[in-house]
A protein has these predicted regions:
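Nucleotide-binding motor/catalytic cores of P-loop/tubulin-like NTPases across gene-expression machines
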Residues: 43-57, 250-269, 282
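Conserved small/polar residues in nucleotide/adenosyl-binding loops
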Residues: 1-8, 280-287
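Hydrophobic core positions in small helical hairpin nucleic-acid-binding modules
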Residues: 3-122, 128
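Short beta-strand elements that form the blades of beta-propeller/WD-repeat-like
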Residues: 25-27, 75-78, 132-135, 231-233, ...
Length: 291
């Protein structure tokens, strides 16, 4: 009888019961290679240094725009330019690889369609009722959606945004009282309260978040913010600008915003953005690059 109970207990165990809790870094290259390695592999360094060799690229021009720090029991959410989302437990990824390995093709992990690519990657520990997703498109449309609407996801993923010919470029997690910041390729930015975006269902479209001054301008970065921390903006020529969020006044959604980086031949167009939690330390966060 004792052996029967032991077999029943073993059958009731889930894989997550067997997996240790480890802090890892998840990277996804623009070329579509994803990998996880232990966070202890990296160390903090000073600005201007040579750095340490990271993910090996399979071709010239590939970059790593998406980075997340996660626990192995967290869930990864992959959002695509078509507005679909796929989920994966971190411990389901291949075992930790070396810092210089190229990783695994993301198409081997999630069911991407033809010409579909991942444009945002976030991690969650649970689908909290009071947490929202803030989604931003290439043309500046925004959408706010309750995170629990992503429950019961299967391998086919879920449609989260009615886009038409637009593309989803950024997804962030937000609480009820946080602000949204959007930055464009021409150096404009806008900050507005997230509660100016009415929560909608998965199949709904978006509303205007920022009004572009030219038809050539596109969104390159978005995140949720408050008065603490800094916004780092980087141009294509590697020039960066770090500004405290307290200097970005909150505006009404849908305006043209303010100039955050004067685009010149010396800076190049805005390529990326990131949040700095202090003047010296960047927060690990995905960035949307349109190079």
């Amino acid at each position: 009888l004792g052996d029967v109970y032991k077999r029943q207990d073993l059958r009731e165990w889930k894989r997550e019961d067997m997996e240790p809790h480890l802090e890892v870094v998840i990277t996804l290259s623009k070329g579509g290679y994803v990998k996880r390695i232990l966070s202890s592999t990296y160390r903090a360094q000073h600005r201007g240094g040579k750095g340490v060799k990271g993910q090996r690229m399979t071709k010239d021009g590939d970059i790593v725009p998406y980075i997340q720090v996660a626990d192995t029991h967290d869930t990864l959410l992959f959002f695509t330019d078509k507005g679909r989302v796929f989920s994966l437990r971190v411990f389901e990824m291949s075992a930790d690889q070396s810092r210089t390995s190229r990783g695994t093709p993301i198409a081997n992990i999630i069911n991407l369609g033809p010409n579909e690519k991942v444009t945002a990657m976030i991690t969650v520990s649970s689908l909290l009722e009071d947490t929202y997703l803030i989604m931003v498109t290439k043309t500046g449309k925004v959408k706010r959606m309750h995170l629990p609407l992503l429950r019961n996801m299967n391998k086919a993923g879920l449609n989260t945004f009615k886009l038409g010919k637009d593309e989803l470029v950024s997804v962030s997690l937000a609480d009820e009282n946080e602000d949204v910041v959007i930055v464009t390729r021409e150096g404009l930015s806008i900050r507005f309260p997230s509660d100016q975006i009415r929560p909608t269902q998965r199949g709904a479209g978006g509303i205007r978040g920022i009004r572009m001054k030219t038809s050539q301008d596109v969104v390159v970065y978005s995140d949720v913010v408050n008065d603490d921390g800094y916004l780092l903006i980087v141009g294509r020529r590697g020039k960066g600008k770090l500004s405290a969020f307290r200097h970005y006044r909150s505006q009404n959604r849908g305006g043209s915003g303010l100039l955050t980086l004067k685009v010149t031949s010396n800076t190049g167009k805005v390529a990326a953005g990131a949040i700095a939690v202090s003047y010296t330390h960047l927060r690990a966060h995905e960035t949307s690059l349109h190079l």
